[in-house]
Amino acid sequence: MTLNKHKKYLIISPSWLGDLIMSQSLYKVLKQQDPDCTIDIYAPAYTMPILDRMPELSGKFINPFEHGTFNLKQRYAEGKKFRDNHYDSVFILPNSLKSAFVGFFAKIPDRRGFKGESRYILINNMRTNKQDFPLMVQRYVALAFDRNEVKTAKDLPKFAYPKLETRPLDKKRASELGLDFSKKNLILGCGANYGPSKLWPVEYFAEISMWWIKQGGRVIGIGSKKDIPTVAKIYENLSEDTKPFFTDIAGKTNLTEALDIVGSSTAAVCNDSGLMHTVAAADIPQVCIFGSTSTNYTPPLSDKAICVESDEPCHPCFKRTCKFKTYACLKKLTPQMVIEKLEQLLSL
């Protein structure tokens, strides 16, 4: 039995941008099951512009809690606010105990999620078999189905990948940022909030940039304010003759501007990051770098993505930093390997 008899759903969203984008596959499945259903979402404020590009969603409510904040009293007040919405089901996508309280206090009768931090009672429609759904997106999508019908990932029907709406960037804004879309633009997703073990060396990004520019293209270094030093170092490593064709917009765009810039570009090279999942959902060819992390858990959900992945004995460790302090998993993924994949993707 699927959820087609239900009409109103609430999503408790993941906090990480990449996880949030992957969760769109769940919303697409819910709309497939019942095109007339209403899907509301409770998510961090910074994600709201991206959520506006997901046509499956209706109401968007800000989750005010910072990462790691418990505050049971406020969670009770937040849940109580949702009672009058009379949701049929809530989907708790994060694994934390605290993320399950809002749906419980909202008195939503069907509360779905995986076990996570021993969330018995709070989640009354619980799956305990994460190991049977290796990919994070499979876990999200599985929640749309009855546990007795879809027991493992093999039972899942084929589902749609995330697809964010992209729009042409305003010409005035493009000019302010120094962008030129008349050329083939390569996006560099050189950041990753998780930590150094996801960061491909800046010297390697610089080599890729110089190669692309010598093919007649331009390169865009993009990211949040945290990525400003990284993009600046890439620029410093460029040869003088290629620097005029590199545009540094790190910290200068909001999420939707970044999405629209990606959507108007030719290709991308990204670390395993939220931007990687954004590029995938914008349906742009990309090469993805997996050092400490694994494509067996959170791969880019796109037929236009190719991954280069470490084969070090310690891979994947999923650690923020390298315990050996060598970062061999990243350093042994050479620029030439990435260039070959780009050529394969674009038939250069």
Whereabouts are the PLM-identified features?
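Conserved nucleotide-sugar phosphate-binding/catalytic loop shared by glycosyltransferases and other
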Residues: T38-N71, K130, S310, C314
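An amphipathic, basic-hydrophobic alpha-helix
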Residues: H67-Y87, F101, F105
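Mid-sequence helix-capping/hinge segment at a functional interface
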Residues: F114-S197, Y235
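Active-site donor-nucleotide binding/catalytic segment of nucleotide-sugar enzymes
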Residues: P168-T230, S292-T295, V338
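A short, glycine/small-residue-rich beta-strand->loop->alpha-helix junction that serves as a flexible
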Residues: I11-S23, I50, I92, Y194-P201
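Donor-binding and catalytic core of enzymes assembling or modifying cell-surface/extracellular glycoconjugates
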Residues: V202-G291
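Nucleotide-sugar donor-binding patch of glycosyltransferase catalytic domains
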Residues: G113-S118, K130-F133, K233-E236, D248-I249, ...
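An aromatic- and histidine-rich active-site surface loop
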Residues: Y27, A45-I50, F91-A106, V279
